[in-house]
Swiss-Prot record:
Compartments where found: Cytoplasm
C-terminal, as annotated region: 765-856
GO biological process: cellular response to heat; protein refolding
Positions of the UniProt region annotated as NBD2: 555-764
This protein's GO CC annotations: cytoplasm
GO MF terms held by the record: ATP binding; ATP hydrolysis activity
Region of interest called Repeat 2, as start-end residue ranges on this chain: 83-146
Self-association and partners: Homohexamer. The oligomerization is ATP-dependent.
Organism encoding this protein: Haemophilus influenzae (strain ATCC 51907 / DSM 11121 / KW20 / Rd)
Name of the protein in its database record: Chaperone protein ClpB
Gene: clpB
UniProt free text on domains: The Clp repeat (R) domain probably functions as a substrate-discriminating domain, recruiting aggregated proteins to the ClpB hexamer and/or stabilizing bound proteins. The NBD2 domain is responsible for oligomerization, whereas the NBD1 domain stabilizes the hexamer probably in an ATP-dependent manner. The movement of the coiled-coil domain is essential for ClpB ability to rescue proteins from an aggregated state, probably by pulling apart large aggregated proteins, which are bound between the coiled-coils motifs of adjacent ClpB subunits in the functional hexamer.
Annotated spans, NBD1: 159-340
Length: 856
């Protein structure tokens, strides 16, 4: 018999039955080998046909296995196997049936016909498992769809819809889809387009995360509930699985063949199916090779004729990039824009989804948590869309509470560690025989017994609290299942089941849930099971670094004493410290304008008076790290073209993909201190970029993304007017500021100066300030030496001397560092290296007899 006359699937089964016979040491390949291979074949026709015709497939597998084990085994035949006479007869019978059906190729389902026709073991097994010729014939006709087998790959293109699509209406019927709240206008618009005679294909366009896929799920739910116009009733919504369609298409034309099979099956459905293609831009160019058609071109004829009801979904950027380029494809779709929902709509959506998340995480989600998720995500997460970002916050906060419930509470964990520690100590003391050890052992055993009793009591409380929680969650799950069953009964018109559920089971479960929640309401000592607005704020703070959680008493105290903290490192400069501290306090108290940066300052003053030091101190105060400061030296932006380095190169230029120096830093750390050092040295065009940062707290980078500056403190430093500050240091602060501002207004444009919150003029440092700074600098030196094992002590005489030597009214505090290096550090280094100073002893550094002396 010519093997080429069989379909590809049948050929695969024939080769599989041979290896099955060899593996079992059978001399002949029997029909039982072939039926086993066909039944186990992935993507084959036999298993679906048998299931559809009411055959017990599990029993059939067992019977075939038993029959295989009965076959005689021949050891040492060198792997030589032959077809049995019975199998040859069955294959010839398959050929005969193929000719009767006018098939060009022999398909695998004909083997079932042949097996039932011919008397023998295989026929008996099939009949025993419930196979009837008429039912199998009907199942074969249904799976063939009235078509002949004219192609060797005919079997692979069958049941294409089952293989390559997901039935959303079936999922909606079984209650597996999340409820869709709101979005009535968009769903109505999509239905309106679907009702058209031709080009009845809406494409949902919107930003990622606004709920495009949810609209199609909402449509599927409405179809299931019968809440659609007559033209859409009883239709199915199928989602095309592009991954399954492309996966495994090895040969040229295989992908097109699969897609064509899907389209053919859809045309047979005669408009009873709505095909949903998520990420529809992937169709453009999918399967495209040299000379081959892509998926988009295969879809065009069906879309234009109205044979294919298709709903697409894609983002604005991808629609522009892929679909708008192909005008012929674009004209076949009707655009439906999906906007981001408002905060109020998002709250309604979250309230609808709340129950699903409560059941999944086994926690309670409070209403303040829902409101906080919508409002806080809208304000602080600017690069993503509602409701997606709000749902993420709820999901993660619920997950963190669930993790706490599942893990051992902290008091229990602490006690357990203490008990282990005491037991180890007990083991060690039991070996000792002196009186002191025995007394210690007695005390220890007493403490151990007390701790173990305490642990047992706490563990009991923990277990009972966990049991209470799991009880209410179990009732919630049962209630959810009952509600789904009620919907299914309503659709099926089963009035008896509806009344049983609606007036019996559901009220009973609701009563049980109320009782369980009442017992939960009693204060729990160990477990937190409620997601509140505080948990939402915590999750947001971890994700963005922005402190939005309620302030602890410690933090309130810290903010009230902020000036004292800043003055520990910044000496003098009362006005500057007050201005910065007030801006931070306004922000944390929630009083600052939400659409502008926390604060924007221009620090003016001579060199070395503490302008940059104040920024570092502020970063350390806010973030416990000086690295949280984004420092940009504006002297690097003296040329006009260097402006692009701040926001990123425009398209077509080198470095376009890298992003901007300023914008990327703020995108990664939205809550930071931005220091623009020596701002007057930058090109005038740089200030045009800063205008929108200072006014609206936003900046668009080279790639068109909007970067949020609303949670940053923008500080610019400048030396403008420093000569006036030096010359008029004895005048009042307001007079000196007026003089300096006249110079500043000549250099900067009025619109730039007008947008700055506060311009702060720094005073020149006096001798007493320099002495205080010397004390701070020497303290840092002492800390550095401490790591090497040396303890440094400085005398007042030394401080006076360093303050005198390091004082320079023109250069501020910077000469002080040089004075410390030359007068102290150089001689210290020599003495340490020579061995004159040894670690572990106090080193006193003094100024006497006109020289600095270090002694131990």
């Amino acid at each position: 018999m010519n093997i080429e006359k069989f379909t590809t699937k049948f050929q695969e089964a024939l080769s599989e039955r041979q290896s099955l016979a060899i593996g079992k040491d059978n001399q002949f390949i029997e029909p039982v080998h072939l039926l086993t291979a066909l039944l186990n074949q992935q993507g084959g026709s036999i298993a679906p046909i048998l299931t559809a015709s009411g055959v017990n497939v599990a029993l059939l597998r067992n019977e075939l296995k038993t029959e295989l084990n009965k076959l005689p085994q021949v050891i040492g035949n060198g792997g030589d196997v032959q077809l049995s006479r019975q199998l040859i007869n069955l294959l010839n019978l398959c050929d005969k049936f193929a000719q009767q059906n006018q098939d060009k190729f022999i398909s695998s389902e004909l083997f079932l016909f042949a097996a039932l026709e011919e008397r023998g073991t295989i026929s008996d097994i099939l009949k025993k498992c419930g196979a009837k010729k008429e039912q199998i014939s009907q199942a074969i006709q249904h799976i063939r769809g009235g078509q002949n087998v004219n192609d060797q790959n005919a079997e692979e293109s069958r049941q294409a819809l089952e293989k390559y699509t997901i039935d959303l209406t079936a999922r909606a019927e079984s209650g597996k889809l999340d409820p869709v709240i709101g979005r009535d206008e968009e769903i109505r618009r999509a239905i309106q387009v679907l009702q058209r005679r031709t080009k009845n294909n809406p494409v949902l366009i919107g930003e990622p995360g606004v709920g495009k896929t949810a609209i199609v799920e909402g449509l599927a739910q409405r179809i299931v509930n019968g809440e659609v116009p007559e033209g859409l009733k009883n239709k199915r919504v199928l989602s095309l699985d592009m991954g399954a369609l492309i996966a495994g298409a090895k040969y040229r034309g295989e992908f097109e063949e699969r897609l064509k099979a899907v389209l053919n099956e859809l045309s047979k459905e005669e408009g009873r199916v709505i095909l949903f293609i998520d990420e529809i831009h992937t169709m453009v160019g999918a399967g495209k090779t040299d000379g081959a058609m892509d998926a988009g071109n295969l879809l065009k004829p069906s879309l234009a004729r109205g044979e294919l009801h298709c709903v697409g979904a894609t983002t604005l950027d991808e629609y522009r990039q892929y679909i708008e380029k192909d005008a012929a494809l674009e004209r076949r779709f009707q655009k439906v824009f999906v906007d981001e929902p408002s905060v109020e709509d998002t709250i309604a959506i979250l309230r609808g989804l709340k129950e699903r998340y409560e059941i999944h995480h086994h926690v309670d989600i409070t209403d303040p948590a829902i409101v906080a998720a919508a409002t806080l995500s809208h304000r602080y997460i600017s690069d993503r869309q509602l409701p997606d970002k709000a749902i993420d916050l709820i999901d993660e906060a619920a997950s963190s509470i669930r993790m706490e419930i599942d893990s051992k509470p902290e008091p229990l964990d602490r006690l357990e560690r203490r008990i282990i520690q005491l037991k180890l100590e007990q083991q060690a003391l039991q070996k000792e025989e002196d009186e002191a050890s025995r007394k210690r052992l007695e005390m220890l055993e007493k403490e151990l017994a007390e701790k173990e009793r305490e642990y047992a009591e706490l563990e009991e409380v923990w277990k009972s609290e966990k049991a209470t929680l799991s009880g209410s969650q179990h009732i919630k799950q049962e209630l959810d299942t009952a509600k789904t069953e009620l919907e299914q009964a309503r659709r099926a018109g089963d009035l008896a089941k509806m009344s049983e559920l609606q007036y019996g089971r559901i009220p009973d479960l609701e009563k049980q849930l109320e009782q369980a929640e009442t017992s939960e309401g009693k204060e729990m000592t160990l477990l937190r099971y409620r997601v509140t607005d505080e948990e939402i704020a915590e999750v947001l703070s971890k994700a963005t670094g922005i402190p939005v959680s309620k302030m602890m008493e410690g933090e309130k105290e810290k903010l009230l004493r902020m000036e004292d903290e800043l003055h520990k490192r910044v000496i003098g400069q009362e006005e500057a410290v007050d201005a910065v501290a007030n801006a931070i306090r306004r922000s944390r108290a929630g009083l600052s304008d939400p659409n502008r940066p926390i604060g924007s300052f221009l620090f003016l003053g001579p060199t070395g008076v503490g302008k940059t030091e104040l920024c570092k101190t502020l970063a350390k105060f806010l973030f416990d790290s000086e690295d949280a400061m984004v420092r940009i030296d504006m002297s690097e932006f003296m040329e006009k073209h260097s402006v692009s380095r701040l926001v990123g190169a425009p398209p077509g230029y080198v470095g376009y993909e890298e992003g901007g120096y300023l914008t990327e830093a703020v995108r990664r750390r939205p809550y930071s201190v931005i220091l623009l050092d020596e701002v007057e040295k930058a090109h005038a065009d740089v200030f045009n970029i800063l205008l929108q940062v200072l006014d609206d707290g936003r900046l668009t980078d080279g790639q068109g993304r909007t970067v949020d500056f609303r949670n940053t403190v923008v500080i610019m430093t400048s030396n403008l007017g420093s000569d006036l500050i030096q010359g008029n240091k004895d005048e009042s602060y307001s007079e000196m500021k007026a003089l300096v501002m006249s110079v500043v207004s000549q250099h900067f444009r009025p619109e730039f100066i007008n947008r700055i919150d506060e311009t702060v003029v720094f005073h020149p440092l006096g001798k007493e300030n320099i002495r205080a700074i010397a004390s701070i600098q020497l303290e840092r030196l002492a800390k550095r030496m401490e790591t090497r094992g040396y303890e440094l002590v400085f005398t007042d005489a030394l401080l006076d001397f360093i303050g005198e030597v390091g004082y320079d009214p023109i250069y501020g505090a910077r000469p002080l560092k040089r004075a410390i290096q030359q007068e102290i550090e150089n001689s210290l280094a020599q003495q340490i290296l020579s061995g004159a100073l040894l670690p572990g002893k106090v080193v006193t550094i003094d100024y006497a007899n006109a020289e600095v002396q270090a002694r131990q």
